[in-house]
Amino acid sequence: MSEYSIFTSESVSEGHPDKMADQISDAILDAIIKDDPNARVAVETLVKTGMAVIAGEVRTNTYVDLEDIVRSVILDIGYNSSDVGFDGASCAVLNAIGKQSGDIAMGVDEASEKDLGAGDQGLMFGYATNETDVLMPAPIYYSHRLVERQAYLRKNSILPWLRPDAKSQVTLRYENGKPVAVEAVVLSTQHTPDVKQSDIREAVMEEIIKHVLPEEWLHSNTQYHINPTGQFIIGGPVGDCGLTGRKIIVDTYGGMARHGGGAFSGKDPSKVDRSAAYAGRYVAKNIVASGLAAKCEIQVSYAIGVSEPTSISVNTFGTGKISDDKIATLVREHFDLRPRGLIDMLDLKRPIYRPTASYGHFGRTGDSFSWERTDKADALRAAAGI
């Protein structure tokens, strides 16, 4: 991967229709896994004008009120009246959830707990870089913080004319592999009909952009695009249909690292699309935190029903203190990347998933985000002899 001199990433708010769908899917997963940690869950959501549809496959011994969960998530996000364009209290909720296929269950379950088979084939990537304190790429990190700030101002009525739907985009200039300046910022936010565009631009600039982005990165040639098409009154599921799993680059590294293609939300941890991507982040972050490399990307792959990964690869893009092959050997020695091993390593059978469904799965803080720990860094450093 060559060095970029300019790089752009984007994020979307919790009120974006695709993120609404992700949050509904993960709220359902949380409700089920809270009472049945061994449940198998794969839930997809679609939201469109006046309607939410949930579909997928579930195997569980517990009961949850799916309609109530759907409505609660929509209302919590802020879609609570026809004035906003969508009302969680009155929208239709259609349920098309069925049972998990017996063929899939056989491949995953008919092994010992230690040798739990992967829920599907696939390839997953994890990534970390030392360009931010949380070891995330700066463009996606700051894109998340912009829309997170928009939601804070909206929910606390600091800017009461804000509505739930919003998008951000940050373009950074790099020198010697480090971000040094903001070249462009895009912030589009839904709003009430009665606010002036000039007031929106001023408030977004002062309360969101300047509040979030490092002052020293802003310069006289920075481009600011605030609601560049003009008014943004119609948004959310009225403006666009929302689907689970349609913001996989927003969910991960903003395009800075490769992606295996599998989405996360609505999937229990037996699905390696999710759990192995989390483990990949954990591995890469510990490698960077240990000082073994300034940036690291790990790829891991699986076959359905097989516990051992079919491959583990490491790329430090020329920043490694030791060879990538030696780091890959350390990964195999210090991390159990079998499905059961990584579930136990990261304690993934918990109701921790809805918070991941907005503002990124990585670079977050708090006990729920166990894949963000750097508790293996010292052991890796010692084993590498650096």
UniProtKB/Swiss-Prot annotation:
L-methionine binds at E57, Q100, D240, K271. CDD domains: S-AdoMet_synt. It is found in: Cytoplasm. It catalyses: L-methionine + ATP + H2O = S-adenosyl-L-methionine + phosphate + diphosphate. Mg(2+) binds at D18. Residues 100-110 are annotated as: Flexible loop. It is an enzyme of class 2 (transferase). Keywords: ATP-binding, Cytoplasm, Magnesium, Metal-binding, Nucleotide-binding, One-carbon metabolism, Potassium, Transferase. Homotetramer; dimer of dimers. Belongs to the AdoMet synthase family. This is S-adenosylmethionine synthase. The gene is metK.
